[in-house]
Amino acid sequence: MTINRVATTAINQSSSQVARETKVRRKLVKERSRLKRATVRNPNAKIIVNRGDLPVIKLGIRMLGRRPNSILKAGQHRYQRAFIQRLKNGRWHVMQRVAGKNRYPIDVVKIPMAAPLKQAFDENVDRIRRERLPGELASALKQQLRIAIKR
């Protein structure tokens, strides 16, 4: 369906834009969005986006130095006084000491994704709907007419 093609374009362009802004691989951003496809019965496509923060462990980790105050590099990001630790739930995460927190002085290092994802999807979905949808619908209608006339 035409709507599904336009929605897929919106997902791809939004994911690329967010990946550039946050300096995260496009694949990691794109897998956070799903498309509930439009059907003949329900002609509405629905884009579902996980806007939660992205844990840094997903970027791939390199330790620069083995001192207590060493730098941990994840993708293009650098984190001072960070370390890798296995949590009680069995997952590995990058942790960092947080100044000013008395009770739990370490925290999982995350990249905030909510604001860039919301902004990019709002902009791109509206723009692509305005620009691409009429042309796509026209070409789909032409194709259906071509098929119907051939019979």
Each language-model region and where it sits:
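Short, Lys/Arg-rich flexible segments
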Residues: 1-151
